[in-house]
Amino acid sequence: MKHITIIGAGLAGTLCGLYLARRGYEVELFESRPDIRNSPTDYGRSINLALSCRGITALKAMNLLSEVNKIMVPMRARAIHEANGEVHYQPFGRHIDEYINAISRSDLNALLLNKAELCPNIKLHFNMKLHSLDIHNKKIKFENKNGDFVEASYHRLIGADGAPSHVRDMLKNEGIVSASRDFLSHGYKELSISKKHTKGMAREHLHLWPRDSFMLLGNPNPDDSITGSLFLANEGKDSFAELNNEEKLHLFFKTQFPDAYAAMPNLVQEFFGNPTGHLSTIQCSPWYYKDECLLIGDAAHGIIPFFGQGMNSAFEDCRILDELLDEYQDDWSRVTPVFYEQRKVNTDAIAKMSMDNYHEIHSDIRNPKFILQKQIERELMLRYPEHYVSMHVLVMFTNTPYAKAMAIGELQSGLLEQICFPITDIKELNWQEVEKLLSIYDKKLAKII
């Protein structure tokens, strides 16, 4: 029987459903929330996401990229705004064609749902909150918007219900998986930067206002407005708890983000009206029960958003699952353990890299030594493209497994430390000495690749 039940009709669940429907499966998607296409908000979740190579590859394989291109905005570099008004720029890639893309979560989700609705072998169910799961008898119970309970049986179940996954929690309660959700001491809040006031800000850039223990981030929108995300401690000094009145809020933004503040006419209403989002990392093992239940996306491996890889790694799950179903002729008893073994090591790696990047963009990004290393790294990629490709480029602009990219990045950190140790300016570099170090690096790299 080729029937699949997917819990969660967000980004990962809907794309997974499209992949499986293409394989001939009868797919039912159950979503606890109302249909996002008919809802005015995105339930307080992060509105803008970063789409890069891994996500693009997964969408392209489903012939969706041409339509997705219409709703995303290129981000060609970081624009780093200092408190004194200075702005510095750091390209993401090696050349003009390497950039990431800002995309609205709700717009992308709506596009995927529209595609799913057109598939005759996909059924969509909204306002169906998972109430209970009988994993041994393959039965599920939902609560609908009227408070009534609806029971159903399933043949095979996929949990794609995000970081607060009920499927994962129910598997954990049965002793089938071990799982934890670790929260950062920081949260985030969505704030808007009006298009009327963004004329002085670079278009097609990811805007960053890093301030050591907190940060404002801005993603561009198609209408030239910017969607901001304020990342701030939940408690203590410079925290959401401390900014508890309008006077404190105005003073904080005037002092810390003066150029952004001037472009935020709705700051007070949005700050006190929008929910504060949580940031967490999910650890779970295994992700499956026999060949009958599988977790994907944030439900299995949710991460903090500071490498822009949450959606991309979830979409990569969908593509790799499809490839394994090809390889093993849809034998799920072989696919599920191999999928877990392949993905777990890589999603653990991107979780660690995301945490490292969290520290990088909060404080390191303005450190003179860090800036020098980035300058040298860029020059290494230009001079020796066959020898040196940075970890960031491997993560964002290739499909290199995350674990391999991380191992290469650790090797590169050592190389850059050696190159930078005696100098304070890139003009002081002795390129003959650099080439000697690069030769040693190449030998170590060969063992990883």
From Swiss-Prot:
Cofactor(s) needed for function: FAD
GO function term, MF aspect, one: kynurenine 3-monooxygenase activity
Gene3D superfamilies recorded: FAD/NAD(P)-binding domain
Reactions this protein catalyses: L-kynurenine + NADPH + O2 + H(+) = 3-hydroxy-L-kynurenine + NADP(+) + H2O
Alphabetic keyword roster: FAD, Flavoprotein, Monooxygenase, NADP, Oxidoreductase, Pyridine nucleotide biosynthesis
Tagged with keyword NADP: yes
Pfam families xrefs: FAD_binding_3 (PF01494)
Keyword Aminoacyl-tRNA synthetase set for record: no
Annotated EC: 1.14.13.9
UniProt-listed GO biological process terms: anthranilate metabolic process; kynurenine metabolic process; L-tryptophan catabolic process; NAD biosynthetic process; quinolinate biosynthetic process
Biochemical pathway: Cofactor biosynthesis; NAD(+) biosynthesis; quinolinate from L-kynurenine: step 1/3
SUPFAM superfamilies from the UniProt entry: FAD/NAD(P)-binding domain
Family: Belongs to the aromatic-ring hydroxylase family. KMO subfamily.
Protein function: Catalyzes the hydroxylation of L-kynurenine (L-Kyn) to form 3-hydroxy-L-kynurenine (L-3OHKyn). Required for synthesis of quinolinic acid.
Name this polypeptide is given: Kynurenine 3-monooxygenase
Species, as recorded: Legionella pneumophila (strain Corby)
